[in-house]
Amino acid sequence: MFTVKVPATSANLGPGFDTLGLALQLYLELKVTIIPQSTRIRFFVDGEEYPEEIFGDNLVYQAMKKVFAEAAVVEAPGLELTINSSIPPGKGLGSSAAAIVAGLYAANEILEKRFTQEDLISWAVEMEGHADNVVPAVAGGLTTAMLYRGNVYYQQFTFPPELKLVVAVPDIQISTDESRQLLPKKIDFMDMVNNLQRASYLLASLIKHDFRYLPAAMDDVIFQPRRKQLIPGFDRVFSQALGNGAVGVALSGSGSSIIAFCQQEEKRVAEAMQDAFAASGIQSQLMILAADPDGVKVLR
């Protein structure tokens, strides 16, 4: 028996669309028990057993099947799979990436680590469609990733430990596909230049622990202005977070969660963000987290 533990992730961080990502201390755990002399798979989610006709669509299961197929395994061993996840789905916190990574790493563990981390990341990006959540889920910390000629390349950095992360999770569920439909087919040249400047400055500022201009560096001019129409109270939440002490704020992934970076006053910032959502008639949950430095772990 072993457990695969995968962190939630926050992608983009403002201007770093499909590029920047951050692992969070909020987890999906997949417990795997191998059943000798059996080929049956039993699947449990939060204590409830799923019938086969339902769990076949689960991303954990699909990811495991992907690895077994790549290894030319005709018949997988009997397994009992138990998922417990604290990552809310459809909230821009990398729930699908966590599920995919958990399944890939679980199957690879069963196969005695036959495949490399590069293999697993490549398949995860293939399944997810982009690297910004997958890479920090695997590597931990703050990451920047690129796809080039079919390959995934990334760098990982230590996120400043003095920054706490306030995540406001409104009672609004947004699919990534729905959110991406709002994105422009063409981008204004100067908007592209502005976002490129800000993403570069943001990454350098976090590496140097210089937070003076994070509000400017995280001010995305292309994607958040379009996606915010799905989130009532968006502008007020941003302004209240910054006005109460946050050093930076961004939409987390495709939303609906909003993440604020805080050196101090994180409880005050959290309450201000929740009050701002409430003023628009939206209930929200709050989490005060730290960055996860390690990424996926296999625990025995």
From Swiss-Prot:
Which SUPFAM superfamilies does the UniProt entry name for this protein? Answer: GHMP Kinase, C-terminal domain, Ribosomal protein S5 domain 2-like
Q: In the record, what terms sit under GO molecular function?
A: ATP binding; homoserine kinase activity
The record's EC number reads 2.7.1.39
- One of the record's GO cellular component terms: cytoplasm
Using the UniProt record, name the top-level EC class of this enzyme in a single word: transferase
Q: Which GO terms describe its biological process?
A: threonine biosynthetic process
Q: Which UniProt keywords apply?
A: Amino-acid biosynthesis, ATP-binding, Cytoplasm, Kinase, Nucleotide-binding, Threonine biosynthesis, Transferase
The entry's protein name is Homoserine kinase
Q: What is the lineage of its organism?
A: Bacteria, Bacillati, Bacillota, Clostridia, Eubacteriales
